[in-house]
Each structure stands twice: as C-alpha cells, then as structure tokens.
Amino acid sequence: MSDQTMAGRTVLVTGASDGIGAETALVLAAKGATVHVTGRSADKLRPVAEAVGTEPLIADFSRLDDVRRLADQVAERVETLDLLMNNAGGTFAPSRRTHDGHEPNFQVNHLAPFLLTNLLHPKLSSAGTSLVVNTSSIGNLMGKIVLDDLDYDHRRAIEFPAYGSGKLMNIVFTRGITQRWSDDGVVSVAVHPGPVGSSFGRDSWFVGLLYRSPLKRLVTISVPDGAAPLIALAERGPDPEINGRYFSRFNANGRENKQARDQSIIDGLWERSAALVELT
C-alpha cells in the first residue's frame, strides 16, 4: 500500500494537462489527496482527471473570464481548499496580446493566478490552515517589474525578459500573500522546480526549437525530477517556517532578484494587479 501522507487534503493543481503539473497531481492523488485539475487542453487534461478521480476543469489563463468561471466551479465543488498549486504558465511570444488585451507572459504567469488565488481566498482561509505553492523559475533573475508599465504599453516586450518578469512576480506575489493572509492561516511559498524538459515553452518558437533538438537532454531534467520539489512542499503543508520563502528545488534560499524583497514592489504589484482584474 502506498503512503497516504496527503489523505484528507483537498488540492487544486493548475497547468495539470501534462508535465510537472500532471505528475504532481497523480502523485498527490496516489498519496490520498482529493485532487482537482485544471488546464486549457480538454483532450490532454481528461486522462489526468480520470486518473485522479475527478472531473476536468477546463480553463485558458489567457482569458480572465475562464479564470473567474474556474473559481466559481471550484467553489461549487469544495467546502475548503487545503492546497492551491499555481503551476500554469510558460513562455509566450509577446507580439500577440491576450483576449483581455494584456501582454501574454504577464497575464498567464501572474495576472491569472493572482486573480484565481484571490477568488479562492475564502476557500483557503476556511480550511483553517492552507498552502499556496507558486511555481516560479530561476528566470526571475532576468526579470524587472516596472509598476507604471506592467503591460508593456510604453516599452518593448522581449520574450525571455518578459517571462522572467512574470516569474519574479510569482515570488513577489508570494510575499504579498504572506503579509496579507497569514492571520487567515494561509501559508505561501514560491519554487523553482529546475529546467524541466516538458511543454511549458510550447508557445515559444525558440524554446520549442531547443526542446526538439539533441540539446534537450543536456540542459533539462525529467518531469518526475521537476515535480519532486512541488510534491515535497505539498507534503510539508502549511508550515509557518516556509512562509514567504523562495525555493530553488529543495533549497529554501533560492537566488532571487533584488526586487523580490522591495516592499514598494510587493505592495505596488498587488494594488495594480487588483485594479487590472477589478477586485474590490
């Protein structure tokens, strides 16, 4: 019999159609958790949902109305939410705006999970203690948050720096949750899973080219290896000692951009993001 370290816990994993999201969902379900999964591809998500024993939740994070509908569906399904794994994301060519008119790396990597997490705050807080895990990246080091131009309206968006900025925002958002929701029992942590050889860059021609080349084996780790840090954090649960931390795989002191601890950035990103998604 497999260990049941996650028994009794209710989990939502985003970006669970494949890669580390799917792997994390499958392992946590095997460990006894009730796991709900969401992704944008119905065909790819369906077998994952069947394997964990729940109905698939289809949502495209480039459409904020999908995110709002997803939050409503989750709220209907669960009384409480013990663990939210914000794993959806990737690299995107910035030349094409989202359905909502935002730069895609900004919306998919930050704005959509920011909205979802806020909408699910009542379910997280009603659990007594809960954990939010935000999948970030070492790419945060090449990011830069410009509070007056989050959407690249007045500067050129370049794919990898824009992706890095989104991953930096994941860490900053983690710190914002820590400062605002700790009294509600919500613990938040960000994690770089490692350079995983999955489909996260499928919308990027450059990453797609790299991942189709022999170099992939030299520069990436396997999906199970990439999922391992997420699973370890899930099993650790809402430990106050990790609140607000940024892990580089299993290292609790991952290298992070200096903006990640700038209080004006932490407050400003939250306030501007809330305004953009019309949270009151």
Predicted regions located by residue number:
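C-terminal helical subdomain
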Residues: 166, 190, 214-254, 263-267, ...
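Rossmann-fold NAD(P)H-dependent dehydrogenase/reductase core
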Residues: 1-199, 277-280
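Short, highly charged low-complexity linear segments
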Residues: 147-149, 232-233, 256-257
